[in-house]
């Protein structure tokens, strides 16, 4: 008969395994589960298309990720390829993105609530970093050159900035979810619909309400496409 300490250890291990299971996209239980975007079934992700109706195009996208993208007023453009563009990604737990940065452009502070990101620089130089959770809020940052790789842990606020005033930069990122999501901090806080009470934000940021009103009146650019 197992001792009480052995049972406690087994319980702890089962809890850890269960937590790891729910902490990322579900693992596939068959070769593939192509997303059926027209299915009336509501699940966490997409229902599976009948395998008899699956073909190679469900795993393909002529995305032209080698083609430069036009940037916007924050100086970047994120072209994400996820399950919405390639239905064959359903249950596979991965996406990819091309990020173009104008000179002095940035991918502003944001989080991916459902994915870790690994980024590699294809052209140019990037100053990148992420901030840990409360209470320390430690910044881990690095200047990356062509060919360098950096990891942003799941859910943490992170950013990329092109410090070169004359040359653009390009990066490719892989994300550990078929649908990683993106929450741009400034957009979410100051551009929410309906707006967050200026009294709440003034207290949170320790500024006058007039400053918050001005910030909420701005157009907050979305650079994720």
From Swiss-Prot:
Source organism: Oryza sativa subsp. japonica (Rice)
Known role: Plays a role in broad-spectrum disease resistance. Probably has no oxalate oxidase activity even if the active site is conserved.
Protein name from the UniProt record: Germin-like protein 8-6
Residues that, per the record, bind Mn(2+): 110, 112, 117, 158
Residues of the signal peptide: 1-23
Positions of disulphide bridges: 33-48
Record's keyword terms, sorted: Apoplast, Disulfide bond, Glycoprotein, Manganese, Metal-binding, Secreted, Signal
InterPro entries: Cupin_1, Germin, Germin_Mn-BS, RmlC-like_jellyroll, RmlC_Cupin_sf
GO molecular-function term, one example from the UniProt record: manganese ion binding
């Amino acid at each position: 008969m197992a001792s009480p300490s052995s049972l406690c250890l087994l319980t702890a291990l089962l809890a850890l395994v269960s937590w790891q299971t729910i902490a990322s996209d579900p693992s596939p239980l068959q070769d593939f589960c192509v997303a059926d975007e027209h299915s009336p079934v509501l699940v966490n992700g997409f229902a599976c298309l009948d395998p008899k109706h699956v073909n190679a195009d469900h795993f393909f996208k002529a995305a032209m990720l080698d083609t430069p993208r036009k940037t916007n007023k924050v100086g970047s453009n994120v072209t994400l390829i996820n399950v919405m563009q390639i239905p064959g990604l359903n249950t596979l737990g991965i996406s990819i993105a091309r990020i173009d940065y104008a000179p002095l452009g940035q991918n502003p502070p944001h989080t991916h609530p459902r994915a870790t990101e690994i980024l590699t620089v294809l052209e140019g130089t990037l100053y990148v970093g992420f901030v840990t959770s409360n209470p320390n809020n430690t910044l881990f940052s690095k200047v990356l050159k062509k060919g360098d790789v950096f990891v942003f842990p799941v859910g943490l606020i992170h950013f990329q900035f092109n410090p070169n005033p004359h040359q653009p930069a390009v990066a490719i990122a892989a994300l550990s979810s078929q649908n990683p999501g993106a929450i741009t901090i400034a957009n979410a806080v100051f551009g929410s619909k309906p707006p967050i009470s200026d009294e709440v934000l003034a207290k949170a940021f320790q500024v006058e309400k007039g400053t918050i009103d001005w910030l909420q009146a701005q157009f907050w650019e979305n650079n994720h496409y």
